[in-house]
């Protein structure tokens, strides 16, 4: 998108008088009419009463204040990508990173407040922690996340329910073995074996995930409803379900919440460059004047910044330009 830095700023000296401001306005207008440049008049200080009178007399809009022409983050072609909610699954976050070719995502609230960031490293770490069978309960994973990740459908229960207890169990063993492993509140991954499904329900599991797209019998559905056990049907096999189930956890459980390296739209690019040289992150969130999230900036964006072009008018002394250049 076009940025202010791509315009040519025409500006007079500090503590401007009438000739300084009028020179900037006139020369900016001349360059706009006689060249391909896009020029904008600015002033390097407050206008005096004489200047205000002259501009009002001729119906000329006063130029905007500009006491510093050094580039800010708002002048950089940063990525205006939307934030994602903390309820987003690890799998979905990874897919967004893959599609957008970015390794850091901002996590925002409904009113666009920055809540944290999730990186591809965070997702990789979570995926390697496969032995934590209680992760869905710890992270308060929604059934909706599980359905989305496994491509499943809800057979018994509500999509908005949340995993609050239990461990993940793979129920491919015999019903006799299931009786000794499944506990109340567990999440059990099963096939179409009727006896195993019934055993898991009788052991008061909280959720059954029936794999291979198998249909769930009416009797099992009725008993599950009576026992308060939710049932899902998923097209994947038990191996894939076991691999994907931990990726259903929400990113809010893994994201970085504190000490987030972020910038504002008015942060000088020089300061940003110094910070980026000291840390290994590639993308950094940007906040607007209201403290709301508005985009991400990377080293590449900063390097690609076009230098700001300036035309100085009515500058007779070297000290005249110190306040703006």
Predicted regions located by residue number:
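Short N-terminal binding/cap micro-motifs at the start of the first secondary-structure element
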Residues: 16-22, 50, 319-320
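N-terminal beta-loop-helix "entrance" segment that forms/cooperates
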Residues: 30-33, 37-61
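Short hydrophobic alpha-helical runs that function as membrane-insertion/retention elements
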Residues: 40, 63-65, 105-106, 188-190, ...
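Bateman/CBS regulatory modules and CBS-like beta-alpha motifs in cytosolic regions of diverse proteins
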Residues: 66-96, 108, 114, 141-156, ...
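A glycine-centered beta-loop-beta connector
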Residues: 76, 97, 105-123, 276, ...
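A short, polar/charged loop-to-alpha-helix boundary motif
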Residues: 120-137, 301-310
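Long, charge-dense
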Residues: 132-133, 221-259
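Conserved small/polar residues in nucleotide/adenosyl-binding loops
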Residues: 324
